[in-house]
Amino acid sequence: MPSRNALWTWIKLLGLALAVLDLALVTAQSNSPQTCPPASDISPCVCQVKKNGLDILCEATDVQHITKAMSALKGKSPIIFYLKLRHNNLPKLQGFVFLALDIRHLTIHNSSLATIEETSLSSLGRGLTQLDVSQNQLSSVPSSALKNLHYLLILNLNHNRISQIHNRAFEGLDTLEILTIYENKLTLIEPDAFRGLDKKLKRLNLGGNDLTAVPQKALSMLDNLRKLELQENRIKTIKEGDFEGLENLDSLILAHNQLTEVPARVFFHLTLLNSLELEGNSISYIAKEAFEGLEENLQYLRLGDNNLHIIPSDALRPLHRLRHLDLRSNNISVISEDAFVGFGDSITFLNLQKNDIKVLPALVFENLNSLETLSIQNNKLTRIPEEVMEPIMDSLRVVDIMDNPLVCSCELVWFPNLLRELKNRDDEMLQKKRPMCTMPNEHREYYVQNMPLERMNCVGKKYHTSSLSGNGAPCKVTLMTSLLSFVTGTALIGHGRFR
């Protein structure tokens, strides 16, 4: 008769064996090949087998056919990785319609959906990670239907008719990381609207609505938010404290609102902000302390399509990490020689196109020793002297000065010669954008590379000598001229330097 110890050992081994067997059965079930049901059972829906499960599309049908297709899928334990209901007549999502189904990504798009019953999604709480109900007729957040989706990561409510977000509208969505409510009719967001989203929410899109002010109280609890989109609203003013509580914000988009000024310290709490978009407003004034608090991290600043008449240098000077500065499509007519002093040494991209700039001061680019891309096309420049461009030629890779009223001159001879030397390079932009200049005496336009050099008495004069690396390495071009040279087109100038 076996001893007590031997018996216990045998029982433990048996238990271990059963546990291993159970694990094997679970693994086998999860790894078992997924199969679509017969096409006739789910028609007009169609099914495909994908790597992670079934991909089912129900398009241009109605609630009866969708309900029939869902019933055919029940009891077979498939993983439905994508269920896409698009362009259907589905005004109401019935309760328990997805009961006993394992759905990971659910899309109900452009299907006239106006009502989501409380029990319609309740069975999906442990599996659903993405829900897209965009382009429908929802007039409010379907809070009761969402509250059990405890593993949801992404919720898309774009293009509906939601006008208000009530308190605790997203309660239960503890794991939500992305919430997008773009192009609705939002006018009011209650103070506790986002209660419960503070743990995980990283991105919030409230763009394309009718908000007239920043919903500060509702936003202040989202201390883990990384990206906030408020573009295309009717926000007229922003003030200090509007963004308090958003200390981890990396990107803020306020483009295409109705702002007329940027007041002092308005972004003071956003010390980690990397990107700020203010284009498409009517901004004519930026306070000297407007960007206080952003000194250490702001790298991308977009101020295009506003009403600025000067470069706001005083406000920009503290931004010593700024890399990308976009000032296109303003009303800037004069640039001071010290416009970029104090902050220009880190800028790699500068866009000044579509302004009214007539003259570039000799030392205006003196501090831009990291500049790689310069866009000054579509201004009113007649001359761009070599002395202006010389400080940035070591770093410059792209320069675009198309659509300026340049005057044909012997000073431009270096440019067509440079183009010929670069002709073997695959430069699509260079081929599409060929600069032009006007011959004063003839009142005629020429492509710069086709200027009549003999009639201009330019032949025989030394304008440049050059050497180019044969292996496509950065080129070095030396200009030998007593005249000032013009940069007259768009060229990729890999580390080129003009002397």
Language-model region placement:
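Extracellular leucine-rich repeat
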Residues: 2-499
